[in-house]
Amino acid sequence: MALNLKIGDIVQNKYRIEKLINRGGMNSYLFLASNLHVQEFGPLQKRQFTRLVLKVVQRTDKINDNNWKKFLDGTITTTRVSHKNLVQTFDVVSPRLSVLSENQVIVLEDTVMIVMEYVDGPSLREMLNQKGYFSVQEVVYYFTKLVKVINYLHSFEHQIIHRDLKPENILFTSNLTDIKLLDFGIASAVIRNAEKTEVLTDENSLFGTVSYMTPEVLESTVNKEGKRIRKPPTVQYDIYSLGVILFEMLVGRVPFNKSIDPKKERETIQKARNFDVPLMGNLRSDVPVSLENIVFKCTAVKRENSKWMYSDTKQLLADLAQWQTEQTLIKPVHERILEGQNEMRELMVSNYLPWYLRKGVLIFFSVVLLALLIAVVSFFIITGVVVHS
């Protein structure tokens, strides 16, 4: 039966659905739920366990047996980690769920439920919508915490790559003194050794959030059967996303404009291959060069820039520790190619600009050039007449 949990439904005779929080990758849903067995806990635990978040993932037809098993293994791996800046996981239920809905018991097969702590604070997205951007000191404080928890995930033998880092998945505690990282709905658990790289989650689908996705997600390779598949994810997936988040925390927007046409997601993702990240100092005067360089090194996926890109989060943390030192730009302004520099050319060839507007622009420039030509010719004729007389 398809996943269709509603407000008031009781899952596993234990959790009452309060509301749908969000929908994520791999047919996953986040629900806020109340714990019906909270009386089993002591007074100090009741506050933590009264309200919980349920992450429910149901298998789809696109996921074969092997990939579903890999996903389950990867889920178990990701839920065994513990860090003060990770949303805590209390339980995992699979492969089926029992749901009491409108006095009828429904069993959901091939379904996983992850029971997580509820963080009673705003998301980074909500804070950005409210504040616009953060002070430099606030950014360094919160961003360092975020990088440290990503470094922790990357340090496992079963290397955990989050793959969907974005402001919506970063939560603040209620007093705004700390952050919690949420949502491993599309995380990849990767085993790396000398012989091979094995990915424990399905890599054939393009998962993530476009504005925070590195162009590397589009790269593919050919397997032993001659089938083209996506390359295994690397830590640079998360590092690129971190750079975009740092940029957004400082200036309130992402580095590259999202394509108007939702069908052109790949075009948006590829922009980091074609353009350099804009200088934040042009948008805000107090951004230090050190943070400009950190953003640049996180997002340096252009071929000529790749030599500067971080190979791991340890390098990023080392640079963050030195953010107050005087620095010069790694790549000078005059060597950077920015998205807006080709704006007029893009407008002229854009499918979004109606033909009559494109024609109007061409006519305008033709008239201007003709007027300039007439002016120059007239000047020489008049000058020639005066000199001759």
From Swiss-Prot:
Keywords, alphabetical: ATP-binding, Kinase, Nucleotide-binding, Serine/threonine-protein kinase, Transferase
Matches recorded under Pfam families: Pkinase
Species of origin: Mycoplasma pneumoniae (strain ATCC 29342 / M129 / Subtype 1) (Mycoplasmoides pneumoniae)
Protein name in the entry: Putative serine/threonine-protein kinase
PROSITE patterns on file: PROTEIN_KINASE_DOM, PROTEIN_KINASE_ST
Domain Protein kinase as annotated: residue spans: 15-356
Highest rank taxon of the organism: Bacteria
Entry-linked InterPro entries: Kinase-like_dom_sf, Prot_kinase_dom, Ser/Thr_kinase_AS
